[in-house]
Amino acid sequence: MIKWLQRAGCLSAHAVVPQAPAAASVQGRHDLAFDTISNARDLGGLAGAGGRRVRQGRLYRSGNPALASAADLERLQTLGLDMVVDFRSPGEKSPEEAAFGQRFHWVAAPVLEGSMAMDVLMPRLRASTPAQMDAFMLEVYGDFPVRYREAFAGFMRTAQGGKTLLFHCTAGKDRTGFAALLLLAALGVAQDDILANYLESNQRNAQFNQTALARMAGLGVAPAVMTPLLEVRASYLDASMRAIDAGWGSVDNYLRDALEVDVAQLRGHYLAG
């Protein structure tokens, strides 16, 4: 699946992904006006199978919404969400988030359980080089379709029910990005558009990332070491695709055989036109 890298103009695993989103993604996205929920967007508008487009107002992705402002929570409630799917592990959550679960049907589907907790990450970050952190992220993405297959299968089963969904992790880029790949691939969205949607996180999280770099520098983590953890890179998504190709031969096979997705049913729910 090296074409994912070539199309993004990113032939090196260490190359920095361009910050500007691709035109196809700009045309297909529907921005959400949140002040305290990062990386939030509607997947509606992207071109899918058979000349149809992904329905707006049905599939949303974001960073963690659970500590949002009161105004943003009110805005979130207007979306008519049937369910909010959280890919974070228990160690990434705080007690202050409990109130969110009282307002929304909030379902845990933990991926990378334990791996992203700060007490686990900090020793790794302090001991690693930028190249080692890049390799760590490639390993993480390679694990998504294999080690965490059941979590993503459960997510796809939920989507197959035709629910209006918001799905998120912490920054809405890695676990959420892979989940978006699965959904959009099942809906027949072109690989270029899937990749462009994935890479948008760099622009959308730019302020979040700068704040994180400054905070972590104060804790003894060099910006160059932290950057691979904060960015999305075409090479990361390619690691997932390579794992899928190695185990199942194609994304279509993975969706059908590993996740048992009914693609026709999904398209009936989420494609318009």
From Swiss-Prot:
Q: Could you tell me the keywords of this UniProt record?
A: Hydrolase, Protein phosphatase, Signal
Which EC main class describes this enzyme? hydrolase
Q: Does the keyword DNA repair apply?
A: no
Signal peptide limits: 1-15
Checking Pfam families in the record gives: Y_phosphatase3 (PF13350)
Q: InterPro entries annotated for this entry?
A: Prot-tyrosine_phosphatase-like, Tyr/Ser_Pase_IphP-type, Tyr_Pase_AS, Tyr_Pase_dom
Q: Which reaction does it catalyse?
A: O-phospho-L-tyrosyl-[protein] + H2O = L-tyrosyl-[protein] + phosphate
PROSITE patterns linked to this entry: TYR_PHOSPHATASE_1 (PS00383), TYR_PHOSPHATASE_2 (PS50056)
Q: Where is the active site?
A: 169 (phosphocysteine intermediate)
Q: What is its EC number?
A: 3.1.3.48
Q: What is this protein called?
A: Putative tyrosine-protein phosphatase H16_A0669
Which species is the source of this protein? Cupriavidus necator (strain ATCC 17699 / DSM 428 / KCTC 22496 / NCIMB 10442 / H16 / Stanier 337) (Ralstonia eutropha)
